[in-house]
Regions:
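Short, well-ordered coil/turn segments that N-cap beta-strands
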Residues: 4-6, 61-65, 92-94, 111-115, ...
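Active-site-adjacent beta->alpha loops and helix N-cap segments on the catalytic face
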Residues: 15-18, 22, 75-78, 100-106, ...
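Conserved, mostly hydrophobic/aromatic
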Residues: 1, 11, 41, 67, ...
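An active-site metal/cofactor-coordinating segment within enzyme catalytic domains
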Residues: 6, 12-64, 69-72, 117-120, ...
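Short beta->alpha linker loops
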Residues: 98-102, 164-165
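Surface-exposed amphipathic alpha-helices with a cationic face
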Residues: 2, 58-59, 87-90, 104-112, ...
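Distinct, well-ordered alpha-helical segments
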Residues: 75-88, 102-119, 125-132
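C-terminal active-site rim and adjoining tail of enzyme catalytic domains
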Residues: 13, 43-51, 116-184
């Protein structure tokens, strides 16, 4: 993948025993990741070693990374632990993003990398526009249909559009001046 892209996007979740793992889905076999210990997760995954599952060092991943921090259904103490554990992992060329705008705002001064918020509905555009004016470093990960909204007015040079799978759209958005696109 690194041959064809500038960044790799991956989801970060926290386990019941407060370990960070790279895992897209919120659950595993109908149990939430946040409720499972690392050992319980390992017992359900074939051929995965503990040191491969737990994200403990930036050295585990090559290239630039967009870490999407998944906080859905977490309590605030777990959210704080998740973000605090991410801080030493982040590399200056990375981007850390989340649907949890509050946590991005709370931790942005501590990040050693770029940071951004994720938008997937039109109502969020107004608040995001306000943030774009007051925070010139913030990036915006925008669901592609929001670009068609008459309310879209975010700085394209700090906008990443998802999910774009057609080559023509990919080229079009980059030609428009978008910072990037996320594709499957």
């Amino acid at each position: 993948a690194l041959e064809y892209c500038d960044y790799v996007e991956t989801d970060v979740r926290i386990t019941a025993d407060n370990n960070l793992i790279l895992f897209h889905d919120p659950d595993l076999n109908e149990r939430f990741i946040k409720e499972l210990t690392t050992e319980e997760i390992l017992s359900q995954l074939d051929n995965v070693k503990k040191d491969e599952l737990i994200l403990s060092s930036r050295d585990q991943i090559k290239g630039k990374v967009n870490f999407e921090i998944k906080t859905d259904s977490l309590l605030q103490p777990q959210i704080d632990i998740l973000f605090q554990k991410m801080l030493p992992i982040l590399h200056p060329e990375d981007i850390v993003t989340s649907f949890n705008w509050k946590s991005i705002q709370d931790f942005k001064e501590l990040f050693s990398c770029r940071y951004g918020i994720i938008l997937d509905h039109e109502d969020a555009l107004f608040e995001a526009k306000s943030l774009s004016i007051h925070d010139e470093d913030m990036f915006f990960m925008v669901e592609r249909t929001l670009l068609d909204s008459r309310h879209f007015d975010l700085p394209l040079n700090r906008t990443v559009i998802w999910t774009v799978n057609e080559k023509n759209d990919f080229v079009h958005f980059l030609d428009m001046g978008a910072f990037g696109v996320i594709t499957d």
